[in-house]
Amino acid sequence: MSWLCQKSINVFLSEEYLDKVSRYMNADKLLEENFEITQQQITVHCDCDHGDWQFCECDLEPLDQMEALDLTDIVRIWTNGGILSPKSLENLHDWIWYRINDPDNDPTDPEYELDWDNANRKILIDCDSFGVPQYQNFSVSVRGYLFHIHELEVIRPHIVDFLVHRKPVIVYYQ
């Protein structure tokens, strides 16, 4: 697959959250050198066509002021490229389910529900002969938060770990 058809992926997170993540990753230099933090903004992307939480019926609440971190390159670095196949989706589901249902968690607690079957999914599965992206829908609800992953070429367990096991974030297509 050519990276020519990739789209930007932003993750919204607070400055405090970013600091914690950078320490966890031990990659302060990587973050400083490769990613530009955009101005604070209030943005929520829902899975309605218009993508505006103010006019949709999705169960999403507006986030507090957040800063956007472009994770496109870090996704490429961690995964070495590739396309999320149906088998990868299955593995992703199994991995999340395993991680959120460890002995320290109550699997009946709504906080740890994984609404996989009812999730709308939108994942880049391929590019046609002209380089036009071909998509499937994908989103997942974890620990009471709905994570939308739109037009994202690659995702692996450590990316999900980055998203799931800290403060809630929403990945969206810009």
Curated annotation (Swiss-Prot):
Family: Belongs to the mimivirus L39/R874 family.
Lineage: Viruses, Varidnaviria, Bamfordvirae, Nucleocytoviricota, Megaviricetes
UniProt name for this protein: Uncharacterized protein L39
Domain of life: Viruses
Organism: Acanthamoeba polyphaga mimivirus
